[in-house]
Amino acid sequence: MTSSLPLAAVVLAGGASRRMGRDKATLPFDGPSGTTTMVERVLSVVSARCEPVFVIAAPGQALPELDAVVLRDEVRGLGPLLATGRGLRAAAEAGRSHAFVSAVDMPALTPEIIDVLAGPAERLNADVVLPWDGRDHYLAGIYRTALHTVVAALLDAGERSMRALVDAVDTQRIVLPEQPALANVNTAADLAAILPPRLGQQTAVTGASGTGNSIPN
């Protein structure tokens, strides 16, 4: 069931990809619609629920032509917090109050993950709603776009981690069993282990419970 909450999407594509040994955003991926790149695969998923979509890329990073707004990090290598703040600010300026923030290296992501989070994000007065399947998934959550000001303050204080952001604001966690759709691809072996999901398959997210539950850090 989809939520009526209008969402932007922020896809972080500018990571260093050290363990993969090459840019993960442009890594070929055999998806349900044929061979594509990782960034195009993730965009196809988030675009099913979110508009507009922003891709945060590294300076000079080569990307295919994308149906999204591409923004460049001003400095390379400062981590996801800076990129998240940039994307949230752009989403706020586009008139969206909330955005789904995603890593580029989750090719098994499905729209149903967004649905599971969007309902609680609409009902609860929380700043961040994250999936929790034994660990936090900071880069698969819904964030209030006004948090870009909090991100800026954290960066000014020398913080670089996403945990610093979620610990500083009201964060709700939605308890799920382990979700293959949330798997990150860091190595070639990780990629080989992922079976392409069917877009729109309702069983892609199973057993969501505990709406609004907070898990101790």
From Swiss-Prot:
Reaction catalyzed: Mo-molybdopterin + GTP + H(+) = Mo-molybdopterin guanine dinucleotide + diphosphate
Principal localisation: cytoplasm
Keyword Cytoplasm set for record: yes
Binding site for GTP: 12-14, 24, 73, 105
Annotated compartments: Cytoplasm
Top-level EC class as recorded in UniProt: transferase
Biological processes, Gene Ontology terms: Mo-molybdopterin cofactor biosynthetic process
Pfam families: NTP_transf_3 (PF12804)
MF-aspect GO terms: GTP binding; metal ion binding; molybdenum cofactor guanylyltransferase activity
Amino acids binding Mg(2+): 105
Cellular component, GO annotation: cytoplasm
Cofactors demanded by this protein: Mg(2+)
Annotated EC: 2.7.7.77
Keywords, sorted A to Z: Cytoplasm, GTP-binding, Magnesium, Metal-binding, Molybdenum cofactor biosynthesis, Nucleotide-binding, Transferase
Keyword Nucleotide-binding included in the entry's annotation: yes
InterPro entries: MobA-like_NTP_Trfase, Molybde_CF_guanTrfase, Nucleotide-diphossugar_trans
Domain notes: The N-terminal domain determines nucleotide recognition and specific binding, while the C-terminal domain determines the specific binding to the target protein.
Family, per entry: Belongs to the MobA family.
Job of this protein: Transfers a GMP moiety from GTP to Mo-molybdopterin (Mo-MPT) cofactor (Moco or molybdenum cofactor) to form Mo-molybdopterin guanine dinucleotide (Mo-MGD) cofactor.
Protein name as it appears in the record: Probable molybdenum cofactor guanylyltransferase
Gene: mobA
